[in-house]
């Protein structure tokens, strides 16, 4: 017996009823392994985070883990309402312009498994417009922010600089694709021009460690015969 429900994981978290969730490999995940998604789940569960925001998601891997973590906290007795949607156990916000920049999404349809089962609040806009015209206007403060949208240095910096202003005290920011060693050793198919992933790894070097705690979770190369994460960096204001 495992502490994890592998049947559930391989049906609804790492696959869409058997079809592999897009880009899950970038999290080091496989059918029965959550990769760095387990770190996101643990942060939400341990700190009882309620307001969760994901900036960019090709396959919806992280948003579904966010919602599952909120749901499980309710089951564990921390909130009265047991729901995948939103209520006293918080909300999951997913921001994506669905413009093909840094990957294609496969969950835009309201009947997609992600939206039908995990019910993220979907904001179809750029991260900058969403910041000023949704989060700021509604005075929403964030417990956990996952940055995985524009992967240029300027894009990552802008998302961090903006959204770090509306984090709750003790809130955590996670940035995906930060392992420079992974990026530098990634092989593309001949003739296919991949997305530029250098921005996240370059940006984290510039974070002021006098103001922020920074912890990197890199596992590239530990098991060369298995998928590994492209890197996850956790940031928290001191």
Q: What is the meaning of each model-derived region?
A:
Residues 1-2:
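N-terminal auxiliary segments of SAM/dcSAM-dependent transferases
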Residues 5-6, 200:
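Short amphipathic alpha-helical segments that mediate assembly, nucleic-acid/protein binding
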Residues 6-47:
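Class I SAM-dependent methyltransferase Rossmann-like catalytic core
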Residues 31, 41-238:
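S-adenosylmethionine/decaboxylated-SAM
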């Amino acid at each position: 017996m495992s502490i994890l429900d592998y049947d559930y994981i391989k049906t609804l978290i790492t696959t869409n009823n058997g079809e592999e969730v897009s880009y899950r490999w970038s999290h080091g995940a496989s059918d029965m392994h959550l990769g760095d998604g387990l770190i996101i789940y643990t942060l939400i569960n341990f700190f009882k985070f309620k307001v969760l925001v994901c900036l960019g998601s090709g396959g919806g891997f992280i948003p579904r883990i966010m919602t599952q973590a909120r749901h499980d906290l309710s089951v564990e007795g921390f909130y009265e309402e047991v729901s995948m949607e939103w209520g006293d156990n918080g909300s999951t916000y997913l921001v994506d312009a669905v413009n093909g920049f840094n990957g294609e999404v496969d969950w835009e349809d309201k009947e997609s498994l992600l939206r039908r089962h995990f019910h993220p609040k979907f904001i179809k806009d750029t991260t900058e417009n969403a910041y000023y015209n949704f989060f700021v206007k509604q005075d929403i403060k964030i417990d956990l922010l996952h940055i995985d949208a524009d992967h240029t240095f300027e894009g990552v910096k802008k998302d961090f600089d903006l959204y770090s202003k509306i984090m709750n005290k003790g809130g955590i920011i996670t940035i995906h694709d930060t392992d420079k060693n992974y990026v530098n050793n990634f092989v593309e198919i001949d003739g296919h021009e991949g997305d530029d992933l250098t921005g996240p790894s370059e940006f984290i070097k510039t974070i002021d460690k006098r103001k922020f705690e920074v912890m990197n979770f890199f596992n590239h190369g530990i098991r060369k015969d298995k998928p590994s994460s492209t890197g996850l960096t956790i940031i928290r204001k001191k």
